[in-house]
């Protein structure tokens, strides 16, 4: 456990160091704004993948591997959305993530559990690794609310369940996937392509309602009203009228 905590601290120190170097280089004019955004995004991907590996390592002695009925390793995908998915992170961006696995299976270690339960434990560990505040601060704040059914839904979804969900999901949920991008996980290139295909289908091959524009406009007005909290003397540059959300 002590070694695990040290690895988590090193991960955070690495993140803080590289972020400082990127910021310094941008201020000195050594890298452009666009290249800095790309660098911040790549750094986040590296940290997330390292935290995923560390989370699996920490549970390996208890659960072993997770395999399907044929004895093949179960696959997993970490999908970034928002600024992470669009490769346009800023220095204070949260990480919008969803998690997808290949389906049924069970662990091979002393403690036997199903694939769904195993992956949930892994992701709970990953979230703790990245967002819990310790003496070295925290790495990132994570937002997993864009998963199917939001906070009411399971943290990790089987691929077929994820696909079926988006056959009848809300327009804004399809919209949220426009920038979705696989950034990590475990499995073959074929597996990751399957995930990409499902996301592509959810974004570009669904049948939008006839009043799509009106519904998107209504959602934007609702967010503006509920989140911006603007007044004559106070403006919200991100969520207010004419702010960053409208620009994007």
Predicted regions and their residues:
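A nucleotide- and high-energy phosphate-metabolite-utilizing enzyme signature
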Residues: 1-248
